[in-house]
């Protein structure tokens, strides 16, 4: 299983889920994605377009010699996972998306649902030059710390902030928002077996897009709603996420290596 993190987090957001998967005998890998890893931090905004992020995951599978993988993502990681599954269904056995619905459903909600439109206002702010870096890094990252609240474990918060306070890292992470393009919302429906997990207490993602998510999955689809939890589902409800991934893998096993060349 490849586990993809979102903003403003790192691979550490998946630590407990990965441990639970390992206990179940399932190997996983959680990379620090483009911009978060100092070895993959281009400076051009165009280098953070969705197709580039998708290419990173396909390249990672190639590097590991994996023809097909189980894919899970949270927040921005969910958007990348949806896009990988839509563009490369031959490489994805199952998809588990957490918090963010299919990008087309999310785009519809931002345009048509006043609540979601208001909740998504931060995305426009994050796309501005310079100002969001100043706001998020000010006063020892107090805005980020408040956003995590007491849900995200202290050691994970420390790791996220260690990464994001490195020179150029916050700008690189925010470039994901600056590189957004309307065409990125027009990805195809997903055909692979999919589980979507959402918490009704998520202050960033509201119900309108969630309820349309299944319209964009033509393969087997399972929806799990967690009552009143936060946006930080992998940290707050790791057993729910790990169990959902495990159940889906058991129903649709594969994770095949690439054939010899």
Show where each model-derived region lies.
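A short, glycine- and basic residue-enriched loop/turn
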Residues: 10-11, 79, 230
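Flexible "cap/lid" subdomain of the alpha/beta-hydrolase fold that forms the substrate-access gate
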Residues: 29, 36-68, 72, 76-226, ...
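Conserved HGGG/HGGXW glycine-rich cap/lid loop of the alpha/beta-hydrolase fold
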Residues: 1-40
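A short, charged, Gly/Pro-tolerant segment at domain boundaries
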Residues: 260-261
């Amino acid at each position: 299983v490849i586990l993809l993190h979102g903003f403003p987090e790192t691979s550490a957001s998946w630590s407990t889920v990965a441990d639970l998967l390992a206990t179940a005998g399932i190997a996983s890998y959680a990379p620090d994605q483009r911009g978060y890893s100092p070895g993959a931090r281009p400076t051009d905004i165009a280098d953070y377009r969705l197709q580039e992020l998708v290419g990173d995951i396909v390249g990672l599978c190639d590097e590991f010699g994996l023809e097909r993988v189980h894919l899970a993502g949270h927040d921005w990681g969910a958007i990348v996972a949806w896009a990988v599954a839509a563009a490369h269904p031959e490489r994805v056995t199952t998809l588990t998306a957490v918090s963010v619905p299919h990008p087309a459903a999310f785009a519809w909600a931002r345009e048509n649902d006043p609540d979601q439109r208001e909740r998504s206002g931060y995305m426009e702010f994050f796309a501005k030059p310079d100002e969001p870096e100043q706001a998020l890094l000010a006063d020892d990252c107090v805005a980020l710390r408040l956003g995590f609240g007491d849900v995200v474990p202290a050691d994970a918060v420390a790791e996220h902030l260690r990464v994001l306070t490195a020179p150029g890292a916050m700008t690189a992470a925010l470039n994901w928002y600056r590189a957004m393009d309307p065409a990125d919302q027009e990805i195809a429906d997903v055909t692979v077996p999919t589980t979507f997990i959402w918490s009704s207490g998520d202050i960033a993602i509201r119900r309108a897009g969630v309820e349309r998510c299944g319209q964009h999955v033509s393969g087997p689809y399972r929806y799990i709603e967690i009552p009143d939890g936060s946006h930080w589902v992998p940290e707050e409800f790791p057993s729910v996420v790990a169990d959902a991934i495990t159940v889906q893998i058991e129903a649709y096993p594969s994770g095949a290596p690439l054939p010899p060349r």
